[in-house]
């Protein structure tokens, strides 16, 4: 090569290019060839020449090689020609062998095809088996799911669904049936939800229907526990706690109908059996439903629904019947429903996790408590029967104690009970007003007669009357008071008992109860009994007999008040040394009543006097008196004498005051007769007749119709009349006018105005007589004198006016 | 003071304790009834004005205690009575038997010309009756006086009883006045005398 190169005498550049062409790949020839053209303008011609030279060199070398190997080639061809013959022989042999093989192998081929078919089948079978082994568990689980759904084992069904979704479906998700299953699961879940919710609704309806029984049982337990000892209470609490324990892992798979587990008959037979709410109601629907919703991740929906429904039920339970206040059973049903409701809530609070919370139950209870208090306040105000109010108090206390035992605060209920207690006492006061009225209505207002020791002791046992003198008297004898006194005393004690009943179980101290009782008793005495007494005394048709006896009765009732104080002290078991902040004010009641009765006696007597005075039939122009006192006045005097004669049991001071009042009233009435503006003329004869009547009054006054008057005290009632009449009958004007204003005047009590009025009535008489007496000197002189005295009296009257 | 009535008649109620004297008076004067028995002590009275033949009559009716211990006091009022009602209780035979004693008391203490009347009270309690109406009537006939069964409770015959007695008193009074008139005859002086006599008679009657 080197030699060829030297002989051609090529350009070094073209040498390099040819080297590259020979060494590089075909793909990279382009750039190399382009470099040829990029070079000198005629470069490619020279390049072609060099290229042809390279070609001829290579051909020469090839020729040399062929010459060198020529002999070997010929030998080889000769051998090949020999082989040809051998080959032709071999070909015949192989064809024949092949033909024989073909004939012999035909059966083998047939068998082989069978084998191939079998192997394909086996492979297919294997594949199918593998696939099926993946699918079968899914189908089994789905079948199980269906079975669980049919058996209502929803929780297990949910578990199965979860396994299907998480474990089995990924293996077979490409299959159609699997898609169908996957699409069906949400529907099944919704079905489970709906069924569980339906169960829950049934449960809610059930506990609503059975709230009464639940509440009744709980309240009975609360009542029973009050009679147990402390240790027994502890024992019950432990038992109760044990019953409240729930093992969530053992939630029953079977769903029982939500019914009371104990029939009413069983209840009656086992009245003393202590039952828990779980013994009465099947709570499993709540537990199952809660778990199902938890598993489904929809716990909040369940909680919201449950709470919402229970709030609705609470409002229903808290809505009383419109006529609840009419019977104690109405209240009882109301209370038992409420207790039943909250006992269930408390149970669920303790056995579930978060379904209800303490905050939720407290909120619910506060709402309920406000409603309950409003309801009780409204309905109790309709009660007019104290026994019903008392029953309401007892029920309320049991109600409060029951719920307090479950942890609900009930202080506001006890506050309400104090309001109801005031109303209870008001109701009692009304009832006792009726009682007192009946007692007064039935009294015969005469001293109680007793004919033997037995009867005497009966009265003494009812009323604490102590009188050694009466005790020594022989039978038959009489107590000074009438039948109403022991009856009232007994009824006041009954009132105290009734008032005390309300305070039982209200958790108040004896001192507080004692004070409350005294306040109530004070109201009874100072308001109720006082009103009844005053109404009795002011009855239009009450007679002197009744009034006199009332005075005696109130005296003895007043003395008995200290025994009532002792009675209250004993009944509340407080120490005798305890200072009472409240004392009985009954004393003032009886004093006031006595004063009213006394006043009424004076009024009645004066009315009788007025009736007599209206019968007066004076002939005011008579010329000569009858010579005897007027008939009406004698009847009047005799009547008064009889009155004071028969009412010997009237207290001395009252009798004296009554007598004085009567005399003063009579005197005033007689004076009014003389001064009556409708009476125009009075004759001296009439004055003299009138004087006879006044003399009778004075005789009555001086006869001491009532013992105890000193000197002429009673006669002073008629002194004005006496001096006036003396002045006119004696015609002592010179003395009167001369001594007027002097303390020692005989006619000190004669009012000039009065004298003037009466004198003018007599002057009129004289004027009439004047016609006929023109010629009688004495009459003329008398007329002049009257005129003179009239003028002088008039000046006195005017003088008095100036001074005034 | 001007009189507000024409005549004053004084009546008296007597009889055993508890027969209903006060209740009869209460019914007549107040038209009311009180079921509770309250024993009258001593003497009491009520006034009611009625009209008879155009005249205003004031009836002053004295109610007496039936108990023995008040006999002295109540007897003092017999003399002034112009009419007396003897009351018994038809349910209490003893009170009926005692009417004879009460009549004897009247003859002893009352004016000889007093008008009388027997009343059988409580006739509403027929189921407890012990004295038949016939026996009451016979007793009254025997003494030549009027008889009525009454009931203060039901107000049966109460008005009738008092009006009957008042009318009888009025009749008797009118008869006396007529007798007095017929006795007089002649001139003005006699007329004056008659007036004086009438006035005097009237006043005596009141007394």
From Swiss-Prot, chain A:
It holds the Pfam family EXOC6_Sec15_N. Transmembrane segments: none annotated. GO terms for biological process: exocytosis; Golgi to plasma membrane transport; intracellular protein transport; membrane fission; mitotic cytokinesis; vesicle docking involved in exocytosis; vesicle tethering involved in exocytosis. Coiled coil: none annotated. It is found in: Cytoplasm; Cytoplasm, Perinuclear region; Cell projection, Growth cone; Midbody, Midbody ring. GO terms for cellular component: cytosol; exocyst; Flemming body; growth cone; perinuclear region of cytoplasm; plasma membrane. It comes from the Eukaryota. Keywords: Cell projection, Cytoplasm, Exocytosis, Protein transport, Transport. InterPro entries: EXOC6/Sec15 (IPR007225), EXOC6/Sec15_C (IPR046361), EXOC6/Sec15_C_dom1 (IPR042045), EXOC6_Sec15_N (IPR048359), EXOC6PINT-1/Sec15/Tip20_C_dom2 (IPR042044). Its main location: cytoplasm. Belongs to the SEC15 family. Component of the exocyst complex involved in the docking of exocytic vesicles with fusion sites on the plasma membrane. Together with RAB11A, RAB3IP, RAB8A, PARD3, PRKCI, ANXA2, CDC42 and DNMBP promotes transcytosis of PODXL to the apical membrane initiation sites (AMIS), apical surface formation and lumenogenesis. The exocyst complex is composed of EXOC1, EXOC2, EXOC3, EXOC4, EXOC5, EXOC6, EXOC7 and EXOC8. Interacts with CNTRL. Interacts with RAB11A in a GTP-dependent manner. This is Exocyst complex component 6. It comes from Homo sapiens (Human).
UniProtKB/Swiss-Prot annotation, chain B:
GO terms for cellular component: cell tip; endosome; endosome membrane; extracellular exosome; perinuclear region of cytoplasm; peroxisomal membrane; phagocytic vesicle; phagocytic vesicle membrane. A motif (Switch 2) lies at residues 63-80. Regulated by guanine nucleotide exchange factors (GEFs) including RAB3IP/RABIN8 which promotes the exchange of bound GDP for free GTP. Regulated by GTPase activating proteins (GAPs) which increase the GTP hydrolysis activity. Inhibited by GDP dissociation inhibitors (GDIs). Disulfide bonds: none annotated. GO terms for molecular function: GDP binding; GTP binding; GTPase activity; signaling receptor binding; TPR domain binding. The modification Phosphothreonine is found at residue 72. Coiled coil: none annotated. Its EC number is 3.6.5.2. Its cofactor is Mg(2+). Pfam families: Ras (PF00071). The keyword Transferase does not apply. GO terms for biological process: antigen processing and presentation; cell-substrate junction organization; endocytic recycling; exocytosis; positive regulation of cell projection organization; positive regulation of corticotropin secretion; protein import into peroxisome membrane. A motif (Switch 1) lies at residues 31-45. Residues 205-207 form a propeptide. GTP binds at residues 17-23, 35, 39-40, 66, 121-122, 124, 152-153. It is a lipid-anchor. Phosphorylation of Thr-72 in the switch II region by LRRK2 prevents the association of RAB regulatory proteins, including CHM, CHML and RAB GDP dissociation inhibitors GDI1 and GDI2. It is an enzyme of class 3 (hydrolase). A lipid is attached at residue 204 (S-geranylgeranyl cysteine). The modification Cysteine methyl ester is found at residue 204. It comes from the Eukaryota. Belongs to the small GTPase superfamily. Rab family. Switch 1, switch 2 and the interswitch regions are characteristic of Rab GTPases and mediate the interactions with Rab downstream effectors. The switch regions undergo conformational changes upon nucleotide binding which drives interaction with specific sets of effector proteins, with most effectors only binding to GTP-bound Rab. The small GTPases Rab are key regulators of intracellular membrane trafficking, from the formation of transport vesicles to their fusion with membranes. Rabs cycle between an inactive GDP-bound form and an active GTP-bound form that is able to recruit to membranes different sets of downstream effectors directly responsible for vesicle formation, movement, tethering and fusion. RAB8B may be involved in polarized vesicular trafficking and neurotransmitter release. May participate in cell junction dynamics in Sertoli cells. PANTHER family: LD44762P. This is Ras-related protein Rab-8B. The lineage of its organism: Eukaryota, Metazoa, Chordata, Craniata, Vertebrata.
């Amino acid at each position: 090569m080197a030699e060829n190169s030297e002989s051609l005498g090529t350009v070094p550049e073209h040498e390099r290019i040819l080297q590259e062409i020979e060494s590089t790949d075909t793909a990279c020839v382009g750039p190399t060839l382009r470099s040829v053209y990029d070079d000198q303008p005629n470069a490619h011609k020279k390049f072609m020449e060099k290229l042809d030279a390279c070609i001829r060199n290579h051909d020469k070398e090839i020729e040399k090689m062929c010459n060198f190997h020529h002999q070997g080639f010929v030998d080889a061809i000769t051998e090949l020609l020999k082989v040809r013959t051998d080959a032709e022989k071999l070909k015949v042999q192989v064809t024949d062998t092949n033909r024989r093989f073909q004939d012999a192998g035909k059966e083998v081929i047939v068998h082989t095809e069978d084998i191939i078919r079998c192997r394909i089948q086996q492979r297919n079978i294997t594949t199918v088996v593998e696939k099926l082994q993946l699918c079968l568990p899914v189908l089994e689980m789905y079948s199980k799911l269906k079975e669980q759904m049919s058996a209502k084992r929803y929780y297990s069904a949910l578990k199965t669904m979860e396994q299907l979704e998480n474990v089995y479906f990924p293996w077979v998700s490409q299959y159609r049936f699997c898609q169908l299953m996957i699409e069906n699961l949400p529907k099944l879940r919704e079905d489970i939800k709906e069924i569980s919710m339906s169960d829950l609704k049934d449960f809610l309806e059930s506990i609503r229907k059975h709230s009464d029984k639940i509440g009744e049982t709980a309240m009975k337990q609360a009542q029973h526990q009050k009679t147990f000892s402390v240790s027994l209470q502890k024992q019950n609490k432990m038992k109760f706690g044990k019953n409240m324990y729930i093992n969530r892992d053992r939630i029953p798979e079977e769903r029982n109908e939500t019914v009371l587990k104990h029939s009413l008959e069983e209840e009656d037979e086992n009245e003393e059996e202590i039952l828990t709410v779980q013994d009465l109601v099947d709570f499993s629907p709540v537990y199952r439903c809660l778990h199902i919703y938890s598993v489904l991740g929809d716990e909040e929906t369940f909680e919201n629904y449950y709470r919402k429904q229970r709030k609705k039920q609470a409002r229903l339970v808290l809505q009383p019947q419109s006529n609840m206040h009419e019977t104690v059973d109405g209240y009882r049903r109301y209370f038992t429903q409420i207790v039943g409701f909250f006992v269930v809530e408390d149970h669920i609070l303790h056995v579930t996790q978060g379904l209800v919370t303490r905050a939720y139950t407290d909120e619910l209870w506060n709402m309920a408590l406000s409603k309950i208090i409003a309801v009780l306040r409204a309905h109790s105000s309709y009660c007019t029967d104290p026994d019903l109010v008392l029953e309401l108090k007892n029920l309320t206390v049991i109600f409060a104690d029951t719920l307090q035992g479950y942890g609900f605060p009930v202080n506001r209920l006890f506050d309400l009970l104090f309001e109801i207690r005031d109303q209870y006492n008001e109701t009692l006061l009304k009832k006792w007003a009726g009682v007192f009225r009946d007692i007064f209505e039935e009294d015969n207002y005469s001293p109680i007669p007793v004919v033997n020791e037995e009867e005497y002791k009966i009265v003494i046992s009812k009323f604490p009357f102590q009188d050694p003198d009466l005790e020594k008297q022989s039978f038959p004898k009489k107590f000074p008071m009438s039948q109403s006194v022991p009856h009232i005393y007994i009824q006041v004690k009954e009132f105290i008992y009734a008032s005390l009943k309300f305070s039982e179980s209200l958790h108040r101290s004896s001192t507080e109860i004692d004070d409350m009782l005294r306040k109530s008793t004070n109201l009874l005495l100072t308001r109720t009994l006082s009103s009844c007494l005053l109404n009795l005394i002011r009855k239009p048709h009450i007679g002197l007999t009744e009034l006199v006896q009332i005075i005696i009765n109130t005296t003895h009732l007043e003395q008995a008040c200290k025994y009532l104080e002792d009675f209250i002290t004993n009944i509340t078991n407080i120490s005798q040394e305890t200072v009472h902040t409240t004392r009985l004010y009954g004393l003032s009641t009886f004093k006031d009543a006595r004063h009213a009765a006394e006043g009424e006696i004076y009024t009645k007597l004066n009315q009788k006097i007025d009736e007599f005075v209206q019968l007066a039939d004076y002939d005011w122009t008579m010329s000569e008196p009858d010579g005897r006192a007027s008939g009406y006045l004698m009847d009047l005097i005799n009547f008064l004498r009889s009155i004071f004669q028969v009412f010997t049991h009237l207290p001395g001071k009252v009798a004296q005051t009554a007598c004085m009042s009567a005399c003063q009233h009579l005197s005033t009435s007689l004076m009014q007769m003389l001064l009556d503006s409708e009476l125009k003329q009075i004759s001296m004869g009439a004055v003299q007749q009138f004087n006879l009547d006044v003399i009778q009054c004075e005789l009555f006054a001086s006869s001491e119709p009532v013992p105890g008057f000193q000197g002429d005290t009673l006669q002073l009632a008629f002194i004005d009349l006496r001096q006036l009449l003396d002045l006119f009958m004696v015609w002592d004007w010179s003395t009167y006018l001369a001594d007027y204003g002097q303390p020692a005047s005989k006619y000190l009590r004669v009012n000039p105005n009065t004298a003037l009025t009466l004198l003018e009535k007599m002057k009129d008489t004289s004027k009439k007589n004047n016609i006929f007496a023109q010629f009688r000197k004495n009459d003329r002189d008398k007329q002049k004198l009257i005129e003179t005295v009239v003028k002088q009296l008039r000046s006195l009257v005017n003088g008095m006016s100036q001074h005034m | 003071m001007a009189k507000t009535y024409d005549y004053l008649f004084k009546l008296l109620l007597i009889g055993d304790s508890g027969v209903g004297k006060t209740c009869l008076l209460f019914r007549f004067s107040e038209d009311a009834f009180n079921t509770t028995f309250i024993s009258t002590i001593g003497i009491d009275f009520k006034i009611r004005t009625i009209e008879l033949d155009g005249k205003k009559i004031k009836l002053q009716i004295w109610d007496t205690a039936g108990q023995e211990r008040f006999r002295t006091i109540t007897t003092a009022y017999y003399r002034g009575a112009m009419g007396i009602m003897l009351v018994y209780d038809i349910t209490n035979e003893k009170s009926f038997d005692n009417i004879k004693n009460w009549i004897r008391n009247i003859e002893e203490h009352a004016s000889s010309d007093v008008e009388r009347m027997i009343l059988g009270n409580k006739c509403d309690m027929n189921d407890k009756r012990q004295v038949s109406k016939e026996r009451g009537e016979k007793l009254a006939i025997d003494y030549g006086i009027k008889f009525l069964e009454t009931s203060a409770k039901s107000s049966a015959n109460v008005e009738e009883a008092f009006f009957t007695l008042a009318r009888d008193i009025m009749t008797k009074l009118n008869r006396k006045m007529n007798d007095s008139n017929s006795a007089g005859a002649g001139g003005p002086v006699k007329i004056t005398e008659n007036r004086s006599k009438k006035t005097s008679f009237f006043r005596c009657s009141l007394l």
